[in-house]
């Protein structure tokens, strides 16, 4: 089929020319003598890739294999590919252009290249090949016309169908121009590939044959090419395979069998790769150079045009459709519209090439098939919108349909069984035939909408099968009946199946590669149900066939005449002979007994155990359900991708999401062994393997991943973004168990194999982002990168990852185990009622120990216990953490609390409140410590030690240790070595015993304090002798000193002495000094007066209705009043309040007086704070009032109301903490006044008011560091008076009036406020109540609009009081009717 020519150097051509090997004197000796290296004068500096033929033995052979097949690192678009030899030495970089896409080259033997959707380019002396395949080889296109060039070794065969799997390559724009391909500015690099006889050449020129022609593809780089024969031919010294400067980083020489293989060049003018020529000749095995025939542009254009009939134009003016008639006997047909007829040519007998291409133009065209048309290799191209229909059930077959970009074609014609409709072009084809279409569809570009209509029997089938390939097309389903989902396949590079809101069930997903996309791109949620599990009763029974061919794994039934039994066999390979007659197994057959049911179950179990694989992608608005029968253990493996807004549900079995191993070209084991014997171990024997390091990353995003009774694994190179809901399931994030497809890259069939592969680089590790919810004895294993929260109940969490970051997490009846080498950070709150076990691992809470952050937030962490095991165990508690739980360290582990960092400047209100609990420290820990051999460090920490504690080495820096009782009255802290700086130890005593600090070996540091809390009040006569601290005798006396501490409302200072005894030094409590702390008392008194301040706020808004009520004509009215204000008092007290009042009243005319009676409701929201407390009061209330206005100008106003208060305050004095309480109050007030009119528009109004109230008493009890503390305020009945004068002026219009006024009042208490009683272990003292008074002044406006609407606005302040209103704005509206 393919013969090689020898090359001879031609001075005229300035290069090599082809001479038949049968020509005279063309022998290897003469060729070698004549082939002077003229082309070596051409400097070649470029980077390229390799292909078939002869290559040198310095480079790994796998490079040339991967290059030819666009695999490994030579995937299309790859840039800056570095090439190294077998010794690891740098050879060069392919950096002049991105790696080209070789998919247009015949994928089996590489002797032809697609240059048009229906035409290939090769050499005419290749007369034996009759078909080609593209991509993964799951397709075959037959040659119908060879189109041989008359005077050039070139042909452009026509194919029987439009190719859908790949796009044609671009061809050179210059064509046969002498010297064109020496222009290294325009053509800096040349690549080739082919399947010629495979040789390896050593530096001595010795050839080793690795394989015969057409066995496999190899490829690489060649140098710039000189021209001869008027530019029709080009040549170069490609045989100089060790000359990297001349021939690039991967030199390759074409051998016998490479004829017709392509030569590509990167054209910098067009900025793309182009096909320059096809290889025609070389000068023998391991020769010096090759020749190529340049693509003859005029010739191929002529051949393309010869296969076209005249364009068909639809004209609306002609009226009616284009009527298409066809005579299948003659292969002639016509399209007629009115008086215009267009001839067409279709298939003649078996001659497909007789069919010509038709091009349709004219807007909104219509075609009516009157006869079934067999167009052979002819295609239809639509330049404008068309509708193609038939009224008699006619069909159409041909090469396929091309729909141009922006064009829509409505196709209402069915196909023929056994034939596929090929569709390409960027436009849209809508298939809208009727009934059952027995033909298939292969789509390679644009959009196809399946909208087949039901026939009179209700039957619908748009196509018998659908194949989506090339990565360019989209197929859209209008409903779920259009196609059987199991007949959909995604071929080479795939495309999109848009289910368009329709739910489908797939029993098989046939996806060749990552390009396969199953999507739903509409708002209506669709559910994809997977039902691929094989049931025993569905296992097919096969019988023996004379073809001797079958599928390995299939079940066969044999009625054995020799034993009179029915025997069942499983086929082991693809070919077979006779069944064994003695119920035995052999190399071909596996005997599986006499029971059909058992045999079918065995086959089904094996199939289900083997698992299922989907290489493709899930996208859009989808739910995916995969519910397997109980007992199925096989895995559903996804190494493609997912980005769906719905839920992926897996029930039973296994689910594995993983990255994808990079596919490589491969050879047989014998070839690999032969190369290995020569020192080249690069060659692979399968497309993927578990040992390879190069994997492709994959991403999976679900709204939710629901797992029940499932073994789920997230493998290497995979990222998962979701919320996992696991029920009785195992979840492994960072699963070393992965799968490979031993058929990867070779079509839709797959062969799964399970193994292990552990990512060593961070970039290859799995990543999880989201939340994991565990329930019902689920297990979570975190082995790789983890970012998310955990909510677990009755489950187990294991962490082995060194890159785990936990968000908000709550574990109930769930243990957390950190295994050896793990390093986890709980960056947000962590709460667990179970143990946290840290075994030679590190757990950091809030922040890592080496992290200096300026955006730290308060974090709460609680566990039943924190257990460290192993010398390398670490517990690091970052700054601004609240830790709770006992810490137990078995070995020489390390516990660190506190570190660097600053609070975020923009804390949320919640975090501000949380931070207030720190009491000025960075960290808070409540728990006991059991770490006799460990090292414990604390910085800026408040430790509430609630049980006896031990530490091997303890370092304290600005830390306070509070001894709390726990289960025993007093506790002891024991450490071998203590280094304490600026720290304090708060101990308790009952005047008999006390808490104690014991230091066994050494004690160092400075500026440390001892504080003592008294659990009962000692008398001044008590003489104490209680040891508090025991340390080695060499310890400095001033290591500890007595310090005054505020406890309750008192300053308590212990009296200490230092004594030596039995080789130890002790700090002994001899007595105490107690004094009242005025600051704490004042803070308490200020807080207890909040109710009075709230009372004054309400008083100032009791009687403000007079301006609303005067001169009202209506009989009733409703009103709303809004007050916003703030006040202040001693002790840094401020409050901000908003008061809302609503009411309704009725007017009664009583002689000379108008009486208004009404009811009201009120709500007040108050925020109050002082130096040592802050909080909020919310008040609700209601009441009634009566207002009387005399025509003389006199008035009165009386009111009574009830207020309920809800109070929530944080108190930072005397250890009071949070206090939530309720209170109640009553108000009764009366106001009188008289309005004197100075003129018709001005007035003065003296006023007097008296308000009585009832404020409920309040008592608070708590414990501060073991001391009982209380504060109490008695109930009180305040009586407040107010006198003052208001003056104003009224401005009037036709339907409006406006009154401006100003007022000055004096407000004063007639009774004292309530006394406050404070009590602690030092005793009880009373802060007496007091009177207060203030001046109030303000201005306001009252406006009337018509007879019904009144608006008011008033601004008011006060001065000279202990509590003052800083500002108050009062707005009201009234409507009368």
UniProtKB/Swiss-Prot annotation:
Changing residue 175 to W: In strain: APEC13. The gene is tsh. Contributes to the development of lesions and deposition of fibrin in the avian air sacs. It can act both as an adhesin and as a serine protease. Agglutinates erythrocytes while in contact with the extracellular surface of the bacterial cells. Can adhere to purified hemoglobin and bind with great efficiency to extracellular matrix proteins. Cleaves casein and exhibits mucinolytic activity. Residues 53-302 form the Peptidase S6 domain. One of its GO terms (cellular component) is extracellular region. This is Temperature-sensitive hemagglutinin tsh autotransporter. One of its GO terms (molecular function) is serine-type endopeptidase activity. SMART domains: Autotransporter (SM00869). Its EC number is 3.4.21.-. It holds the Pfam family Peptidase_S6. The lineage of its organism: Bacteria, Pseudomonadati, Pseudomonadota, Gammaproteobacteria, Enterobacterales. Coiled coil: none annotated. Residues 1-52 form the signal peptide. The active site is at residues 125, 153, 259. Changing residue 183 to G: In strain: APEC13. Optimum temperature is 26 degrees Celsius for hemagglutination activity. Adhesive and proteolytic functions of tsh lie in different domains of the protein. Keywords: Cell outer membrane, Hydrolase, Membrane, Periplasm, Plasmid, Protease, Secreted, Serine protease, Signal, Transmembrane, Transmembrane beta strand, Virulence, Zymogen. Residues 1111-1377 form the Autotransporter domain. Disulfide bonds: none annotated. CDD domains: PL1_Passenger_AT. The record marks 1100-1101 as: Cleavage. The C-terminus is blocked. Cleaved to release the mature protein from the outer membrane. One of its GO terms (biological process) is proteolysis.
């Amino acid at each position: 089929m393919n013969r090689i020519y020898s090359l001879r150097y031609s001075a005229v051509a300035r290069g090599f020319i082809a001479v038949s090997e049968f020509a005279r004197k063309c022998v290897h000796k003469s060729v070698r003598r004549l082939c002077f290296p003229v082309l070596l004068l051409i400097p070649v500096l470029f980077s390229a890739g390799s292909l078939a033929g002869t290559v040198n033995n310095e480079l790994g052979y796998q490079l040339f294999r991967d290059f030819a097949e666009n695999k490994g690192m030579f995937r299309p678009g790859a840039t800056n590919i570095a090439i190294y030899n077998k010794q690891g030495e740098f050879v060069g970089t392919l950096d002049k252009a991105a790696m080209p896409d070789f998919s247009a080259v015949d994928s089996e033997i590489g002797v032809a290249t697609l240059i048009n959707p229906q035409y290939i380019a090769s050499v005419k002396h290749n007369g034996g090949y009759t078909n080609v395949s593209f991509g993964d080889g799951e397709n075959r296109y037959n040659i119908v016309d060879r189109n041989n060039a008359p005077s050039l070794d070139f042909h452009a065969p026509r194919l029987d169908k439009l190719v859908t799997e790949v796009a044609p390559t671009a061809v050179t724009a210059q064509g046969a121009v002498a010297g064109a391909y020496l222009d290294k500015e325009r053509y800096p690099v040349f690549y080739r590939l082919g399947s010629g006889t495979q040789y390896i050449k050593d530096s001595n020129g010795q050839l080793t044959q690795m394989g015969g022609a057409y066995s496999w593809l190899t490829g690489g780089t060649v140098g710039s090419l000189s021209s001869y024969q008027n530019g029709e031919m080009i040549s170069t010294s490609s045989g100089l395979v060790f000359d990297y400067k001349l021939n690039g980083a991967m030199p390759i020489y074409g051998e016998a069998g490479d004829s017709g293989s392509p030569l590509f060049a990167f054209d910098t003018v067009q900025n793309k790769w182009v096909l320059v020529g096809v290889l025609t000749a070389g000068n023998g095995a391991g020769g010096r150079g090759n020749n190529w025939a340049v693509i003859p542009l005029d010739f191929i254009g002529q051949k393309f045009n010869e296969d076209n009939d005249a364009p068909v134009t639809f004209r609306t003016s002609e009226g009616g459709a284009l009527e298409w008639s066809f005579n299948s006997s003659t292969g002639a047909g016509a399209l007629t519209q009115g008086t215009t007829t267009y001839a067409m040519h279709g298939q003649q007998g078996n001659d497909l090439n007789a069919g010509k291409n038709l091009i349709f133009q004219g807007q909104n065209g219509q075609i009516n098939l009157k006869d079934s048309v067999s167009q052979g290799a002819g295609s239809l191209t639509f330049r404008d919108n068309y509708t193609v229909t038939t009224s008699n059930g006619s069909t159409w077959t041909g090469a396929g349909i091309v729909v141009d970009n922006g064009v829509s074609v409505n196709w209402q014609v069915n196909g023929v069984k056994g034939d596929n409709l090929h569709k390409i072009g960027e436009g849209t084809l809508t298939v809208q035939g009727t009934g059952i279409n027995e033909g298939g569809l292969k789509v390679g570009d644009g959009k196809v909408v399946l909208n087949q209509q039901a026939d009179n029997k209700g039957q619908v089938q748009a196509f018998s099968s659908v194949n989506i390939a090339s990565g360019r097309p989209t197929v859209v389903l209008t409903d779920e009946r259009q196609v059987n989902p199991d007949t959909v396949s995604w071929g080479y590079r795939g495309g999109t199946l848009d289910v368009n809101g329709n739910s489908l069930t797939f029993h098989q997903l046939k996806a060749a590669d990552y390009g396969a996309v199953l999507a739903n791109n509409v708002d209506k949620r669709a559910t994809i149900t997977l039902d691929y599990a094989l049931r025993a009763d569905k296992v097919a029974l096969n019988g023996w066939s004379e073809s001797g061919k079958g599928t390995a794994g299939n079940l066969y039934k044999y009625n054995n005449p020799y034993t009179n039994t029915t025997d069942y066999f499983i086929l082991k390979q693809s070919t077979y002979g006779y069944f064994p007659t003695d119920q035995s197994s052999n190399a071909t057959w596996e005997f599986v007994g006499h029971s059909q049911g058992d045999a079918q179950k065995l086959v089904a179990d094996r199939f289900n155990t083997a698992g299922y694989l989907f290489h493709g992608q899930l996208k859009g608005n989808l739910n995916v359900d995969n519910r397997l029968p109980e007992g199925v253990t096989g895995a559903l493996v996804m190494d493609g991708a997912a980005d769906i807004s719905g839920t992926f549900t897996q029930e039973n079995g296994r689910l594995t999401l993983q990255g994808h191993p990079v596919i490589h070209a491969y050879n047989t084991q014998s070839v690999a062994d032969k190369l290995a014997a020569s020192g080249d171990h690069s060659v692979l024997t399968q497309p993927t393997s578990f040992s390879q390091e190069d994997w492709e990353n994959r991403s999976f995003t679900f709204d939710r991943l629901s797992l029940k009774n499932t073994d789920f694994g997230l493998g290497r190179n995979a990222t998962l973004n979701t919320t996992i809901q696991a029920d009785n399931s195992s979840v492994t994030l960072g699963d070393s168990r992965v799968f490979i497809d031993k058929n990867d890259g070779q079509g839709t069939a797959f062969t799964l194999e399970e193994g292990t592969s552990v990512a060593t680089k961070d970039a290859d590790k799995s990543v999880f982002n989201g939340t994991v919810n565990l329930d019902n004895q689920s297990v979570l294993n975190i082995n790789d990168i983890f970012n998310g929260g955990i909510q677990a109940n009755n489950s187990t969490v294991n962490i082995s990852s060194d890159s785990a970051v936990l968000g908000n997490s709550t574990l109930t009846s769930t243990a957390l185990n950190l295994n050896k080498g793990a390093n986890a950070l709980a960056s947000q709150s962590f709460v667990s009622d179970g143990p946290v076990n840290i075994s030679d691992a590190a757990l950091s809470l809030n922040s890592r120990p080496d992290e200096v952050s300026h955006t730290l937030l308060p974090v709460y962490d609680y566990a039943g216990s924190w257990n460290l095991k192993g010398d390398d165990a670490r517990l690091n508690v970052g700054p601004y953490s609240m830790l709770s739980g006992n810490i137990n360290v078995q070995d020489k582990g390390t516990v660190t609390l506190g570190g660097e960092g600053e609070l975020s400047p923009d804390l949320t209100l919640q975090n501000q409140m949380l931070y207030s609990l720190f009491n000025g420290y960075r960290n808070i820990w409540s728990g006991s410590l059991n770490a006799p051999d460990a090292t414990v460090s604390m910085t800026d920490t408040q430790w509430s030690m609630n049980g006896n504690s031990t530490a091997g080495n303890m370092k304290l820096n600005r830390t306070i240790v509070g001894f709390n009782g726990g289960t025993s009255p007093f506790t002891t802290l024991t450490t071998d070595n203590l280094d304490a700086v600026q720290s304090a130890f708060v101990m308790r005593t009952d005047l008999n015993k006390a808490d104690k600090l014991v230091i066994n070996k050494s004690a160092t540091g400075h500026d440390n304090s001892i504080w003592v809390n008294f659990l009962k009040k000692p008398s001044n006569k008590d003489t104490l002798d209680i040891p508090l601290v025991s340390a080695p005798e060499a310890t400095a006396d001033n290591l500890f000193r007595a310090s005054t501490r505020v406890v309750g409302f008192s300053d308590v200072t212990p009296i200490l002495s230092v004594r030596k005894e039995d080789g130890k030094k002790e700090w002994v409590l001899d007595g105490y000094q107690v004094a009242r702390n005025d600051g704490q008392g004042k803070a308490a008194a200020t807080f207890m007066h909040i109710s009075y301040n709230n009372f004054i706020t309400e008083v100032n808004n009791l009687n403000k209705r007079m301006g609303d009520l005067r001169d009202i004509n209506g009989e009733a009215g409703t009103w709303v009043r809004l007050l916003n204000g703030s006040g202040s008092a001693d002790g840094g007290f401020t409050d901000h309040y908003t008061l809302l009042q609503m009411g309704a009243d009725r007017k009664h005319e009583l002689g000379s007086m108008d009486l208004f009676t009404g009811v009201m409701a009120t709500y007040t929201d108050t925020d109050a704070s002082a130096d040592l407390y802050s909080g909020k009061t919310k008040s609700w209330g209601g009441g009634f009032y009566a207002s009387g206005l005399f025509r003389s100008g006199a008035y009165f106003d009386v009111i009574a109301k009830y207020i309920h208060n809800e109070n929530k305050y944080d108190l930072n004095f005397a250890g009071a903490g949070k206090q939530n309480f309720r209170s109640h109050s009553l108000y009764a007030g009366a106001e009188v006044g008289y309005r004197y009119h100075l003129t018709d528009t001005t007035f003065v109004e003296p006023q007097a008011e008296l308000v009585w109230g009832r404020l409920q008493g309040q008592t608070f009890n708590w414990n501060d560091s073991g001391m009982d503390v209380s504060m109490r305020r008695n109930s009180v009945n305040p009586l407040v008076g107010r006198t003052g004068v208001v003056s104003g002026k009224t401005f009037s219009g036709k339907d409006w009036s406006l009154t401006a006024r100003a007022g000055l009042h004096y407000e004063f208490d007639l009774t004292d406020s309530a006394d406050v009683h404070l009590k602690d272990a030092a005793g009880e003292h009373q802060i007496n109540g007091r009177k207060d008074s203030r001046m109030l002044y303000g201005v306001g406006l009252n406006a009337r609009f018509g007879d019904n609407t009144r608006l008011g606005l008033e601004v008011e302040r006060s001065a000279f009081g202990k509590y003052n209103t800083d500002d108050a704005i009062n707005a009201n509206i009234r409507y009368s009717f």
